[in-house]
Structure formats: C-alpha cells, structure tokens
C-alpha cells in the first residue's frame, strides 16, 4: 500500500463559483465556519501535506496552508488546479478534493492509497453510480499528458482518463461524502440539515 505520508493533497478552491453568485466558495460560511475549514478538519487527521489551489483571495487562504494559483489562466473547471497542483506538490502522488464538500470521508486518503498499483496513473472516486473527478489521486508522471491536454484546449476529462492508466476507487458505501454546495439554496438547506 502507498503510505499516506508519500502523498500531498490539494484543496481545489480556484473556481469561478458562478452558481454561488461569484462568491469564493471556500470562504463562504456554513454555520459560521468557512467551507474550506470543514474540508481541512476532515483531511488533517489523514495527511500532513495539504496545499490550496486558489486564484482569488489568496491572502485569506494562506492562513490554512500553502497557496498557489493556476498556471493556465482562465481555464474553466478544476483541470487548471490539478495541473498546478502537480507542479507545486513535493510528492510523486498528489490528491485533489474540492473546497465545497464538508462531508469528505475520514478514510478518503487511506482508500486511495490502498488502491494504488505499480501501473496506476490516476485514481478517481466512484460513488456506485457516478465517477467523482474532483476526488482523485494523480501520479506526477501524468503531468506531460495533462499539459498537452490543456494546451489543446480539451475539456472532457474522460479523454485524459483514456490516455492514462485510470482506475476507480469504490465509495459506494458513502455517497454522501460527495455532497457539494454549489448554490446559496444548497448551502442554506445543508446548513439546516447540519444544525
């Protein structure tokens, strides 16, 4: 099994948050606590190597750990953050989680590490019905393929998965860990459920 200490984990907070009215999702409060703090609280017992990908409000995010922005500017979606994370992390294996999922599994890192094989390039979480492409673990050897993918302007992650040795990690026993909060209404509803 890959040791969790040999991985870095990047919290993806670099999006435009258009469905949240453009507000930086990681800094939006849920029950008086920024969303990113929920993610950090879940990740910290699992790994000591946490980084943050943010393209705005970097000074605010620095209180939580090292922060870096995308190298491919104005690239929609998480792929720019994944690319930057692979460049910035000091480990060969780099995991990614979104900043707006307060219920991340307490054994997420371990599950990913257990699934690694010698051939693995990319691991992607699967909830039993759908793949969860922002809950993922990449080996740095994917970086040249990902760079070429972004330079071509490709947006369909499934195309990159086909170029790499991609495997899926089973989270069908805990699909709620992928609940993400994209709109003010979802945030309000989730806050009421959590209270």
Curated annotation (Swiss-Prot):
Known cofactor(s): Mg(2+)
Keywords: Cytoplasm, GTP-binding, Magnesium, Metal-binding, Molybdenum cofactor biosynthesis, Nucleotide-binding, Transferase
UniProt catalytic activity: Mo-molybdopterin + GTP + H(+) = Mo-molybdopterin guanine dinucleotide + diphosphate
GO function terms (MF aspect): GTP binding; metal ion binding; molybdenum cofactor guanylyltransferase activity
Cellular-component GO terms for this entry: cytoplasm
One GO BP annotation of this record: bis(molybdopterin guanine dinucleotide)molybdenum biosynthetic process
Residues annotated for GTP binding in this entry: 12-14, 25, 53, 70, 100
E.C. designation(s): 2.7.7.77
Main EC class the enzyme belongs to: transferase
Localization of this protein: Cytoplasm
Xref: InterPro entries: MobA-like_NTP_Trfase (IPR025877), Molybde_CF_guanTrfase (IPR013482), Nucleotide-diphossugar_trans (IPR029044)
Record-linked CDD domains: MobA (cd02503)
Pfam (any one): NTP_transf_3
UniProt: Mg(2+) binding residues: 100
NCBIfam families membership: molyb_mobA (TIGR02665)
Reported function: Transfers a GMP moiety from GTP to Mo-molybdopterin (Mo-MPT) cofactor (Moco or molybdenum cofactor) to form Mo-molybdopterin guanine dinucleotide (Mo-MGD) cofactor.
Subunit organization: Monomer.
HAMAP family from the UniProt entry: MobA
Family, per entry: Belongs to the MobA family.
Free-text comment on this protein's domains from its UniProt entry: The N-terminal domain determines nucleotide recognition and specific binding, while the C-terminal domain determines the specific binding to the target protein.
This protein's name: Molybdenum cofactor guanylyltransferase
């Amino acid at each position: 099994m890959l040791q969790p200490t040999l991985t870095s984990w990047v919290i993806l907070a670099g999006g435009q948050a258009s469905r949240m009215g453009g507000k930086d999702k990681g800094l939006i409060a849920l029950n008086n606590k920024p969303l990113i703090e929920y993610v950090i609280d879940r990740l910290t017992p699992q790994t000591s190597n946490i980084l943050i990908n943010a393209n705005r409000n970097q000074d605010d995010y620095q209180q939580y750990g090292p922060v870096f922005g995308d190298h491919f500017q104005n690239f929609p979606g998480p792929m720019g953050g994944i690319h930057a994370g692979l460049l910035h992390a000091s480990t060969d294996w780099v995991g990614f989680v979104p900043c707006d999922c307060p219920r991340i599994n307490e054994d997420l890192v371990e599950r990913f590490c257990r699934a690694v094989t010698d051939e693995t390039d990319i691991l992607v979480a699967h909830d039993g019905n759908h793949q969860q492409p922002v809950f993922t673990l990449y080996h740095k050897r994917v970086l040249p393929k990902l760079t070429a993918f972004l330079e071509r302007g490709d947006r369909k992650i499934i195309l990159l998965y086909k170029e790499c040795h991609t495997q899926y990690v089973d989270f069908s026993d805990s699909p709620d860990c992928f609940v993400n909060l994209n709109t003010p209404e979802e945030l309000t509803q989730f806050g009421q459920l959590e209270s």
